[in-house]
């Protein structure tokens, strides 16, 4: 059944609304649906429906699962540099295999693709070269719209909206190389809890989701940081004081 734009979006018609979102070229209609989907940012079922729809239409490549992604949700509005991309590059330099998934900025000034472009690192789509990069350099960058054409269809409207949307929660769940390890920063407790639920449902071997108590979607040097970490199928919660890190500065 085709979704009608004047119909309230519910959990039960979310699939039809999402299908229409990616089929229509009407920016106003796209914005209306995205704003309604934002009401379900803390609903794991709706997030999974959106994720699965985007994945279904993706460009599939052979997985390189023994890798780590540092893709976070972004959108904390604090105008920091792109820390997740910086961390990815640093980790790869000490031989941690990094499959960094990312996109251009939608609600900030420095998306991962913006940073990678400035560094003249090529965003690959070719499966052979992606795997060669992982073996040789321990790093490859995965530009989301190359693999997920549906994300390209909403790039313009997301830029017009200029605030964090439900799509901020998609990147960390859609690594094209199937990275089985994830470190993920997000903005607050509720975001961390919902991302923990989502990552638990997509069969990662291990992950750590964290938020800082000052609103930073990274580990803060100025306030405590709470972690939700999965190891051996168990999820543990731990809060670490910023003073722990400050003693190393």
Spell out what each predicted region is.
Residues 64-71, 99-105, 167-170:
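Core alpha/beta catalytic barrel or barrel-like domain that forms the active/cofactor pocket
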Residues 72-77, 102-108, 147, 213-214:
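Acidic, glycine-rich active-site loops and adjacent beta-strand->loop/helix elements
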């Amino acid at each position: 059944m085709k979704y009608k734009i004047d119909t309230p979006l519910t959990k039960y018609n979310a699939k039809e609304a999402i299908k229409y979102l990616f089929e229509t070229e009407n920016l106003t209609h796209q914005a209306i649906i995205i704003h309604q989907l934002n009401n379900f940012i803390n609903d794991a079922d709706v997030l999974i429906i959106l994720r699965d729809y985007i994945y279904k239409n993706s460009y599939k490549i052979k997985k390189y699962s023994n890798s780590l992604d540092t893709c976070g949700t972004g959108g904390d509005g604090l105008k920091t540099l792109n820390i997740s991309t910086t961390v990815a590059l640093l980790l790869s330099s000490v031989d941690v295999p990094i499959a960094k998934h990312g996109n251009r900025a939608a609600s900030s000034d420095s998306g991962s693709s913006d940073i990678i472009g400035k560094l003249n690192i090529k965003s690959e789509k070719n499966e052979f070269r992606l795997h060669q990069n992982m073996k040789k350099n321990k790093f490859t960058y995965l530009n989301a719209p190359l693999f997920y054409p549906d994300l390209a269809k909403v790039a313009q409207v997301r830029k017009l909206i200029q605030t964090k949307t439900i799509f901020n929660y998609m990147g960390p769940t859609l690594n094209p190389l199937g990275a089985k390890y994830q470190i993920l920063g997000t903005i607050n407790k509720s975001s961390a809890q919902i991302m923990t639920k989502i990552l638990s449902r997509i069969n990662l071997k291990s992950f750590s989701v964290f938020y800082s108590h000052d609103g930073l979607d990274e580990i803060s040097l100025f306030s405590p940081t709470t972690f939700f970490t999965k190891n051996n199928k168990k999820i543990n919660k731990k809060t670490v004081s910023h003073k722990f890190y400050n003693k190393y500065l």
